[in-house]
Amino acid sequence: MFEYLKGIVTKIDPAYIVLDVNGVGYKILCPTPYSYDENQPATIYVEQVVRDTGITLYGFLSLEDKELFLKLLSVSGIGPKSAVAIMAAEDTDSLASAIQNGEVKYLTRFPGVGKKTASQIVLDLKGKLGDYVKKSTAAADLTPSLQDALLALVALGYTQKEVDRITPKLAKLPENTADGYVKEALALLLKK
């Protein structure tokens, strides 16, 4: 029902935050509540889960985290609380990478995840998390000068989408200075 909520974080608890949206305080369960600052504005990507016991809002820092939560929920044996506990115990990049690589033993270290559930997670989600793995490995493969060049392109006004489109081409070039990469990038961007 809700995509996101914008408001002021009024309370931070180990399991949840309270977000004041125009005078209404929403209790939102989060995998990483201490990522927010109290009495500061925040945008929380939320998922509303309706159960017999009540309605609960789960909140995430990014849309990608919310999507990963929904994918975890699609696995038989994983409920919302287990999905949040898994996401709280590990960063999403490492989690997605472990699932992609079929690391059942790695997944069993999460609370409430035994060997059977870990195998089910791998079975259901392997091959469906490519976007998360690409994002996590892509930055690690770039040289510092290329990373600087990509930041410079964004500072020059190019969108992240445009920069992401040419990044693989730049990464294949021989190592260069940041200025050299920017020149190559501008040539690629102007070709379109």
Curated annotation (Swiss-Prot):
Region of interest (Domain I), residue spans: 1-61
Localization, UniProt: Cytoplasm
Renumbered residue ranges of the record's region Domain III: 141-192
DNA repair listed as a keyword: yes
GO biological process, one term: DNA recombination
Assembly, per entry: Homotetramer. Forms an RuvA(8)-RuvB(12)-Holliday junction (HJ) complex. HJ DNA is sandwiched between 2 RuvA tetramers; dsDNA enters through RuvA and exits via RuvB. An RuvB hexamer assembles on each DNA strand where it exits the tetramer. Each RuvB hexamer is contacted by two RuvA subunits (via domain III) on 2 adjacent RuvB subunits; this complex drives branch migration. In the full resolvosome a probable DNA-RuvA(4)-RuvB(12)-RuvC(2) complex forms which resolves the HJ.
GO molecular function (one): ATP binding
GO terms under cellular component: cytoplasm; Holliday junction helicase complex; Holliday junction resolvase complex
Name of the protein in question: Holliday junction branch migration complex subunit RuvA
Region feature (Flexible linker): 137-140
Origin organism lineage: Bacteria, Bacillati, Bacillota, Bacilli, Lactobacillales
Record region (Domain II): 62-137
Family, similarity comment: Belongs to the RuvA family.
HAMAP family linked: DNA_HJ_migration_RuvA (MF_00031)
Alphabetized UniProt keyword annotations: Cytoplasm, DNA damage, DNA recombination, DNA repair, DNA-binding
Key word DNA damage present: yes
